[in-house]
Amino acid sequence: MTIKGGAGDMKTAQADLTTGPLGKQIFRFSIPLIFSNLLQVLFNMADVAVVGRFAGSTALGAVGSTTIFVSLFTGFLIGLSGGVNVLVAHHFGADDQKNLSDTVHSAALTCAAAGLVLLGIGCGFAGGILRALNTKPELMDGAVLYLRIYCLGMPALAVYNFGNAVFSAVGDTRRPLYYLSIAGVINVVLNLFFVIVCNMDVAGVAVASIISQYFSAILVTAALLRSRESYCLRFSQLRFHKTRTKAILSIGIPSGLQNAIFALANLFIQRGVNTFSATMVAGNSAATNADALVYDVMQAFYTACGSFIGQNYGAGKKDRIRRTFLISTAYAFGAGLLLGLGLLLFGRPFLSLFTTDPQVMDAGMYRLTVMSVSYCVSAFMDGTIAASRGLGKSAVPMVIVILGSCVFRIIWVYTVFAWFGTITSLYLLYVFSWTITAAAEIIYFIRIYRQATADLAAA
């Protein structure tokens, strides 16, 4: 990455993503993101491992029953921060200091407010939603308790994702990694303390999670407050700038809803899983940790795609937009393929991290066997969505996701799965929905890419 210097240069000590060899740049940019995402996954796995090994399969199933619901909320916040990332990248690439500062301060308030809203929804409706999902009666109390405590950390999660989006947009992927590492170590230590020493089971894991989330939010906020760059944060300048807030929401809300819709569709899948035994539910919960592991490694390349396209679009460099999309998608596909095959070969040792029950491990292998050869297909869908978002387009990709993933998956559950009634037939819907959605997203991206490059040529 090219590093610009000089007292008057806005990009001082930051990564310039508009020049240099793209293959090497995208890879180097993504490495800290991969480690950051992996750490987050590993720390979440530590939650499940501690519960599964020291609190039993019932506690493991209770925590696992909340996974989709937690993903719905966190997915919305991540999508909202994606709008922040795109706009900061655009203004940073265009060297537009005024709009950059206004975007940062509007985004800080917007994300914090979203976190508070989700806190209220999660705490107020946890029981009703879990009952609607046919959560097993023996898992209900633990699941409701875990979810209500976990949702207390939503404002912190929103603020951390805001800060992470800002730093990633300007090419700094290292600081969020450092902060997450510190918070993650705290999370693991507190997990062990609350569960083993204090015998708090699912409540202990949830409390440890929210403490670490607030710690990471404080660290990233402090870094923005200390910064002297144009993307710095100042409490005195916090306000909702109408045009900037509207721009953030126009990209962030569709992106957030898109992520939430995936989780919403998965609620129907969880409902299908819940029709099987408690052992199958626990095995599914253990195996879904593999999903997070693979998706979050691939997600690093999608983040890189959005940041690179955002800066280059802002700088008017159309030739690098297409190449960024192709390279980042190829990286994501390769990562999904390699990790999937690794899980296929080492599935049982992986599952043994979360449970010692042979029957639960057998149930987990059903999921790993199907999913391990399917993960790489999602690169074509998510990579294209990230590229469209980098060009400032997220509404149409959201509609495509609603139809290709949410609606399609619901139809699958009530037709194909209802007909065959096997867990394998339930898991197969992932690869089919990814393929259909990817085809539509690629067609749309080709259209907006041609329009964007034409606009840049005419400017």
Question: Positions of the model-derived regions?
Answer:
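Short runs within selected transmembrane alpha-helices of multi-pass transporters and secretion channels
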Residues: 81, 150-168, 176-184, 205-220, ...
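Small-residue-rich hydrophobic transmembrane alpha-helices
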Residues: 60-120, 157-176, 270, 283-341, ...
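Transmembrane helical elements of multi-pass membrane transporters/channels
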Residues: 28-47, 149, 183, 212-216, ...
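Short alpha-helical transmembrane segments in multi-pass integral membrane proteins
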Residues: 1-30, 88-155, 197-253, 309-374, ...
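N-terminal transmembrane alpha-helices
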Residues: 17-54, 68-83, 87, 112-119, ...
